Each structure stands twice: as C-alpha cells, then as structure tokens.
Amino acid sequence: MPTPKKGARLGGSASHQKKILSNLAASLFEHGAIKTTDAKAKALRPYAEKLITKAKSGSVADRRNVLALVPNKEIVAYLFNELAPKFENRPGGYTRIIKLENRKGDNAPMSQISLVLEETVSAEASRATRASASKKAAEEAETEEVVEAPAEETATEEAAEEK
C-alpha cells in the first residue's frame, strides 16, 4: 500500500484531490491549455503526463485505466485517437507550465498549463546545424585572417618607407 502524500492536499481530502486532478486533466485534454493556480498546475503535470504515456501505448487495458481516472468517454477517445499520435515521437515533457500574474481577488499565484504540440527538433538535426554553423564560422575566420594579413604587411611597409 503506497504511503499517503505528506502536506496539504488540494481540496482538503484525498478523494477531493483525485476528483480535482481528474477534472483538470479532462479540461486540459479538451482545451489544450488551462489557467489555474501554481499548486494545481504542478500537481496536474505528472498526472496528465502519465495519462498521455498510457494513451501512447493504446492498449485496451490502458484505455480502461485512463477511463477509470478520467470518467469522460469523449475526452478519453480524443486522448487516445487524436492526441496520442501527436506525441508519438516525444519521449516525455508533454506539458508546459507558464507563470502568470497573481489572481486579483486573493493574490494567489496563477499559471497556465498547456500541452506541447510542437514538433521537437531531433538531436541529429541540431547537431547538423551546429556543425554547419561551426564550419561557416571557421570559413569566415579564415577569410578574415587572409584579408587582415596583407593589411598588416602594408602597414609595416608604409612604416619602413617613412623611416
């Protein structure tokens, strides 16, 4: 049996916290981004990412597990059929938390948690761009050296002529 989480819970009780996270995850999958408090966003991130990882596998058992946690068939179907294929090449980090201004009424710290749907740049592509950039920089440095070398010689020649 897992040990209970220490500290304050969202909503007061364990069952209320589970429902809050379930509803926040459903809203996140439905809208793509939601605005909530920092504490809820930080608690939602691992919860939602585990659901997306289960959706990526696509097995019937995982679908039933997700349906037990998010009791909305339409959202679970959307998660498995449309969102999971978008995250197929991404090994993790499906969500992003952006800090916002504090809430006006009670000055609570607010955040926007959103799904990261942009394509990731592979390590090979970034390595290739870095290599090409370093080659260009090396070529530019060589051309600058070639241009600077005659200029220095002419300066020393002019100094010799003046003497």
From Swiss-Prot:
Database matches in Gene3D superfamilies: Ribosomal protein L17
Family listed: Belongs to the bacterial ribosomal protein bL17 family.
A cellular-component GO term for this protein: cytosolic large ribosomal subunit
Subunit structure: Part of the 50S ribosomal subunit. Contacts protein L32.
Compositionally biased region (Low complexity): 123-135
Organism per entry: Corynebacterium glutamicum (strain ATCC 13032 / DSM 20300 / JCM 1318 / BCRC 11384 / CCUG 27702 / LMG 3730 / NBRC 12168 / NCIMB 10025 / NRRL B-2784 / 534)
GO molecular function: structural constituent of ribosome
Name the record gives this protein: Large ribosomal subunit protein bL17
Residue stretches of biased makeup (Acidic residues): 140-163
